[in-house]
Curated annotation (Swiss-Prot):
Signal peptide: none annotated. One of its GO terms (molecular function) is zinc ion binding. It is found in: Nucleus. InterPro entries: BBP-like, KH_1_KHDC4/BBP-like, KH_dom, KH_dom_type_1_sf, SF1-HH, SF1-HH_sf, Znf_CCHC. Residues 15-27, 362-392, 410-484 have a biased composition (Low complexity). Its main location: nucleus. Residues 1-33, 115-140, 362-501 are annotated as: Disordered. It comes from Dictyostelium discoideum. This is Branchpoint-bridging protein.
Length: 501
């Protein structure tokens, strides 16, 4: 047989087998379509992509692939293969969050990105946007990837709140979304109170200190936040009321900053504001004008006088203005103490000097006058050796002075008392004589003044007579000369003379 005959005999058999496979009941239309699709792709020479060939379908792994176990989990993964017993609800929730974070990380880094199977039911796509290089930046894959990243960020924040030691994936980067909060300043209720100065502090030190403690940024925004005439950047919150703007990454930082700021939004009286006093002290330290104590306290060579009221012991008022003086019982106590003092002085001096506190001032004046007269009239004191010459005769005056002088008498003796009474009587007589002499001098002065007044009156009368004679002479002069203008007032052509008297 020739080779051609052999080929002709083999062809029918192959066609028969092919027809049998097609007509067999085990093959469906879908299987047939997929079979022919694979045959065409293989015949074209294009290999299957990574998305088309699943990792689990591979029989051979490359050295870059991660070895898989029977349960499909990598041996290097931190996920538990089986849950240990005795876990709390928080631990189970943290484990579920970790599983979801790892799943999203795997989709973002390795893929594939899941698409919605129902394309007709999905929302319409947004208009396309392009970057500087002309590439589209909001493709469907990019939008799904951003959505997964946002979900992973929320899961990481929740996991860190449950377990502070949780470490996010290595490729995780938190978004730059800042949290803000407004705290309005009550400037309308207290327009004269300096809230901004208390919050900012000297050269911004108070503001910087609060930012360091809380970790949030503190700024003053709104109407009145900038000085008049100072160029500032236009802010979108300029038309808002005056407020404090807090900006932070977390809510805890905002809460800490709010507590620190609200302490300065409560008005305090001027003398009780300790925070303002500390700010002024800090500013003085910066300017170099701080004094630890007043200047007058340094070189003071005197001590203040500690004057207290005699009756109540207070330093707020003198004894004369004490409110306890109007009290009757207290007044009686003062009088009794005064009387005790007078009695003690009378015993020590040997004679009675009792003067009640309510006595008139006339007695005190008489005592002072008597003392002055005693000092002026020395002939009645030590010069005369205590003798009284009013009742002495001529023979008595020639006698020698007595042996006993004033200094030799006892204070309690009757001679001493008689001498004191005689001396007081002499002083009174001298006072009367002096008063009479002064009265005579006053009368003489009055008479002289009256004489002077009479002389002045006589001089004035003489001046008036001279002036009248002068006017009469001028009148006769004008009458004789027949002046067309007539005599002026007073008779003089230049008017009446000036009275210089």
């Amino acid at each position: 047989m020739s080779p051609n005959d052999v080929e002709q005999q083999q062809l029918p058999t192959q066609n028969n087998n092919y027809n049998d496979n097609i007509n067999s009941p085990s093959l469906n239309d879908d299987d047939e379509d997929s079979f022919f699709r694979e045959i065409k792709e293989i015949s074209r020479g294009r290999p299957k992509t990574r998305d088309e060939i699943q990792i689990s379908d591979r029989t051979r792994l490359s050295r870059w692939d991660t070895p898989l176990t029977n349960d499909g989990v990598s041996p290097f993964s931190s996920i538990f293969k089986t849950l240990p017993p005795g876990l709390t609800d928080e631990q189970i929730a943290a484990l579920i969050l970790r599983l979801r974070v790892d799943e999203i990380t795997k989709k973002i880094t390795i893929g594939p990105i899941e698409f919605t199977e129902r394309d007709r039911e999905r929302s319409p796509s947004p208009p396309p946007t392009y970057d500087n290089n002309g590439k589209r930046s909001n493709t469907r894959e990019q939008r799904i990837k951003e959505k997964l990243q946002k979900e992973r960020h929320q899961l990481v924040v929740t996991a860190q709140q449950i377990n502070p030691t949780y470490k996010p994936p290595s490729d995780y980067q938190p978004p730059n979304e800042k949290k803000t909060r407004k705290i309005y300043i009550p400037i309308k209720n207290h327009p004269e109170y300096n809230f901004i100065g208390l919050i900012i502090g000297p050269r911004g030190n108070t503001q910087k200190r609060m930012e360091k403690e809380s970790g949030a940024k503190i700024a003053i925004r709104g109407k009145g936040s900038s000085r008049d005439g100072k160029p500032t950047k236009l802010q979108f919150q300029e038309n808002d009321e005056l407020h404090v703007l807090l900006t932070a990454d977390t809510v805890d930082q905002l809460d800490k900053a709010e507590v620190l700021v609200r302490e300065f939004l409560i008005p305090v009286e001027e003398g009780k504001n300790e925070h303002k006093r500390q700010q002024l002290r800090e500013l003085a330290e910066m300017n170099g004008t701080l004094r630890e104590r007043p200047a007058y306290m340094g070189n003071r060579s005197w001590t203040p006088v500690d004057i207290k009221c005699v009756q109540c012991g207070e330093t707020s008022h003198p004894s004369s203005d004490c409110p306890l003086r109007s009290n009757e019982s207290n007044q009686q106590y003062i009088e009794s103490e005064y009387q005790k003092f007078i009695d003690e002085m009378s015993k020590s001096l040997g004679f009675d000097i009792s003067i009640s506190p309510n006595q008139n001032d006339n007695s005190l004046q008489n005592i002072n006058l008597n003392n002055n007269n005693n000092n002026s009239n020395g002939n009645n004191n030590g010069n005369n050796n205590g003798r009284n010459f009013n009742n002495d005769t001529v023979g008595d005056m020639d006698e020698s002075p007595p042996h006993h002088t004033q200094s030799h008498f006892q204070q309690n003796s009757p001679q001493f008392d008689q001498q004191q009474h005689q001396q007081q009587w002499n002083n009174n007589n001298n006072n009367n004589n002096n008063n009479n002499h002064n009265n005579n001098n006053n009368n003489n002065n009055n008479n002289n003044n009256n004489n002077n007044n009479n002389n002045n009156n006589n001089n004035n009368n003489n001046n008036n007579n001279n002036f009248s004679n002068y006017n009469n002479n001028n009148q006769s002069f004008y009458n004789n000369n027949n002046s067309p203008y007539g005599p002026p007032n007073g008779g003089s052509p230049y008017g009446p003379p000036r009275n210089t008297y």
